[in-house]
Amino acid sequence: VGAYGNIYVGATAEFLLVNKHPAVKAVVIRYSLFDTYTDIVFPGGIYHSWFMDTWNQVNRALDANDVATLSKMIGLNIPFVEILPGVKPVGNPIEGNKALKQALKDHQNNGDVYEESRKAEYRDFYWDKWQNRIEKISPYYYVAEIEASGAAIYSYTGWYDGYYTSAGINRY
C-alpha cells in the first residue's frame, strides 16, 4: 500500500505513516508543509497575514462546497460555474445526498484559521478553542513515528507552492 499527494493530500500521506501500519510501504509527498508554524503561519518569523486570510477564504469555500467562489479565487473564468454541483454525494442517491448535507452542516462550525492563527504569537501557543498546539498539526512533530514506520518517502518540492522549499529541506 502506498499514498501520494500534493499539498494537503501530501501532508495526509505523510500523517498516514504515524500509524505505522505494516501494509503501508511508501508515500510520495509533493509540495507539502513540514512545520505549520514556520512553513505557513510565520515564515521567517513574520506573520503571513495575506496567506492566512486567503487560506481561510479557500477553506470557507471548500467547507460550503462553493465551486463558484473557488473558481473565481484562482482566476478561472468558467461559463455557468454557478451551476456546478461541487462534491458528489457518495453511495446511493438518497443516503448520499443526506450525508453530504450533514457534512456541509458540520463544516459550518470549522474554525477560522485566519483569526485563530493571529493569536499564535509564539511557537508553542496553546489554542483553547482547538485544545491543541500548532506543532501537533505538523508532520515534524511526529518524526519519530514517521521514521519508525519503515516506509519509503519520496518527497520533492520547489517554488511551485509557496514556502515549502524549506519544508522539503527540513524534512531531512
Locate each region found by the language model:
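Solvent-exposed loop/turn segments at secondary-structure junctions
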Residues: 8-10, 34-36, 160-162
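Accessory cap/linker subdomain of secreted extracellular hydrolases
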Residues: 18-20, 25-149
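Conserved alpha/beta-hydrolase "acid-adjacent" motif
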Residues: 162-169
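Alpha/beta-hydrolase fold nucleophile elbow
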Residues: 1-8
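Short beta-strand/loop motif that positions the catalytic acidic residue
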Residues: 155-157
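Hydrolases whose catalytic domains are alpha/beta-hydrolase-1, hotdog thioesterase
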Residues: 12-16
